[in-house]
UniProtKB/Swiss-Prot annotation:
Its main location: membrane. It is a multi-pass membrane protein. InterPro entries: GPCR_Rhodpsn, GPCR_Rhodpsn_7TM, MRGPCRFAMILY. The keyword Transmembrane applies. Signal peptide: none annotated. Residues 1-34, 92-98, 169-172, 238-260 are extracellular. It comes from the Eukaryota. This is Mas-related G-protein coupled receptor member B5. It comes from Mus musculus. The lineage of its organism: Eukaryota, Metazoa, Chordata, Craniata, Vertebrata. Orphan receptor. Probably involved in the function of nociceptive neurons. May regulate nociceptor function and/or development, including the sensation or modulation of pain. The keyword Transcription does not apply. Keywords: G-protein coupled receptor, Glycoprotein, Membrane, Receptor, Transducer, Transmembrane, Transmembrane helix.
Length: 322
């Protein structure tokens, strides 16, 4: 069966006759796209590393920053696998290593999507039921949820890799299809749930009897979700369909998968840009200050006063221990 291996592995079969030119052209386009992926991923690694460093060591920890920190970690891991995968293509290294990178890439991809969904749902809960959220919510919920989400994604991708012959055993067709169906359903669910919760929250903010002011953090999460839908979601859906339906491999060019991988790379790089951009907007204009202050503003879940910034509330910060 045809497996959805990443576009990091080129078929080295020599093509005779008139197909030589076409084969060379495909390889040239492939290398160009992967070169762009490496360049963009390097910038993304730097951005996510800065976010991780600031959230882990320089900013007070709260319920939402824990999720954002884990999202940055997932993006960092995903970008690392993309860079290594592109280098494997250039060096023509072991195909088995490429399969392993495929599993790690999907693991990081799903983990990042889980973090986005968790942030969006928890943000909606904090607005819809504020009394329960601030009084009854157990401590360390964010840390426990992140650990469970990482473990779940690791287990699911291990089963997917084993069933599809990407790790240690031969492919098992029906088991592989089953895992692919579960993965596809999970991707769709994790996209629909935060979209609906964010839309419901927006309606409550605009049309509710007690209007809730829009905070920077809501804007940050909304932009992150929108960017993922347009840039990150195509890879998850398309790669899953490649596993489940062989017809996709003949109908669509393999370069479509390469493009979706590239878009996923751009998505992982965009998140730090969103954080710092939202943090830099003040009184309808950009004000560039220290990265620490910009990130702190982007994580701010309290409304701003007309005269200036409010100090972020410590109540949400007390939900998690440092």
């Amino acid at each position: 069966m045809g497996l959805t291996t990443p576009a990091w592995n080129i078929n080295n079969t020599v093509v005779n006759g008139s197909n030589n030119t076409e084969h060379f052209s495909c390889v040239s386009k492939f290398n160009t796209l992967n070169f762009l992926t490496v360049i963009i991923a390097m910038f993304g690694l730097a951005g996510n590393a800065i976010v991780l460093w600031l959230l882990a060591f320089h900013l007070p920890r709260n319920a939402f920053s824990v999720y954002v920190c884990n999202l940055a970690c997932a993006d960092f891991l995903q970008l690392c696998t993309q860079i290594l995968g592109s280098l494997e293509c250039f060096l023509q290294l072991n195909r088995r290593h490429t399969f392993f990178l495929t599993v790690v890439f999907m693991f990081a991809y799903l983990a990042g999507l889980c973090m986005i969904a968790a942030i969006s749902v928890e943000r909606s809960l904090s607005v819809m039921w504020p009394i329960w959220y601030h009084c009854q919510r157990p401590r360390h919920t964010s840390s426990i949820m992140c650990a469970l989400l990482w473990a779940f994604c690791l287990l699911l991708n291990f089963l997917l890799g084993e069933g599809c012959g990407l790790l240690f055993s031969d492919p098992k067709y029906y088991f592989c299809i089953t895992c692919a169906l579960i993965t596809t359903a999970l991707i769709i669910l994790l996209t629909v749930v935060p979209s609906v919760s964010s839309l419901a929250l927006l309606v409550k903010m605009i049309c509710g009897s007690h209007r809730i002011p829009v905070t920077r953090f809501y804007v940050t999460i909304a932009l992150t979700l929108v960017v993922f839908i347009f840039l990150g979601l195509p890879f998850g859906i398309y790669s899953s369909f490649l596993i489940m339906f062989k017809e996709f491999q003949s109908i669509f060019s393999y370069h479509v998968l390469e493009v979706t991988i590239f878009l996923s790379c751009v998505n992982s790089c965009a998140n730090p840009i969103i954080y710092f951009l939202v943090g830099s907007i003040r009184q309808h204009r950009l004000q560039w200050q220290s990265l620490k202050l910009l990130l702190q503003r982007a994580m701010q879940d309290t409304p701003e006063e007309d005269s200036g910034e409010r100090v972020p509330s410590q109540r949400s910060g007390e939900l998690e221990s440092v």
